Swiss-Prot record:
Plays a role in cell envelope biogenesis, maintenance of cell envelope integrity and membrane homeostasis. InterPro entries: YciB. The keyword Lyase does not apply. Keywords: Cell inner membrane, Cell membrane, Membrane, Transmembrane, Transmembrane helix. Belongs to the YciB family. It is found in: Cell inner membrane. The keyword Iron does not apply. This is Inner membrane-spanning protein YciB.
Length: 181
């Protein structure tokens, strides 16, 4: 249920874009992200920081897109969110308080050097995705960008997540692996 809730705004954005245009889809994205927060709070009695940050970014860049009737803003949002994620992960690692370890370290017990590699891997991933987003958003058609944003970046993120879990699992002790099964 939680994963479906995470994809709700993206699904609504894509569906509305296909029937209308980028501006109606941007408005729908703002509404869907707000709805995501409400449902998340109702179900889990808390709001995740990532959802709050995403809501603020979607609201700011979606509103600018609507008010100025310029799709550049909603396109830049993707890159800026990825940049913020990369910065947050990188800074947390430099300060020896890795975010990924704090989020997953209780379930996935591996050495700190493994968490460091995973963190820098994700920093690199977010930087590359942000740069590729800029290229696709401003060099190719709007429809290509929407498809890339919805399917390409989502697929890349899912693949990256699976690779990360496999890498972490590979670096766990045999005993810790058995506890997860």
């Amino acid at each position: 249920m939680k994963q479906l809730l995470d994809f709700l705004p993206l699904i609504i954005f894509f569906a509305v874009y296909k029937f209308f245009d980028i501006y109606v889809a941007s408005g729908a994205l703002i509404a869907a992200t707000a709805l995501q927060l409400v449902i998340s709070y109702m179900l889990y009695k808390k709001l995740e920081k990532m959802h709050l940050i995403t809501f603020v970014m979607v609201t700011v860049f979606g509103s600018l897109t609507l008010i100025l009737h310029d799709d550049s803003f909603i396109k830049w949002k993707v890159t800026i969110v990825y940049a913020l994620f990369a910065i947050a992960l990188g800074v947390s690692q430099i300060m020896n308080k890795p975010l990924l370890k704090s989020m997953l370290g209780k379930e996935l017990i591996v050495e700190d050097k493994v968490w460091a590699r995973v963190t820098w891997y994700w920093v690199s991933f977010f930087v590359v995705c942000g740069l590729v987003n800029i290229y696709v958003a401003f060099s190719l058609s709007q429809e290509t960008w929407v498809n890339f944003k919805v399917f390409g970046l989502t697929a890349l993120t899912l693949i990256n997540t699976v690779l990360t879990v496999l890498y972490l699992f590979k670096n766990m002790s045999e005993e810790d692996r058995k506890e997860l099964k």
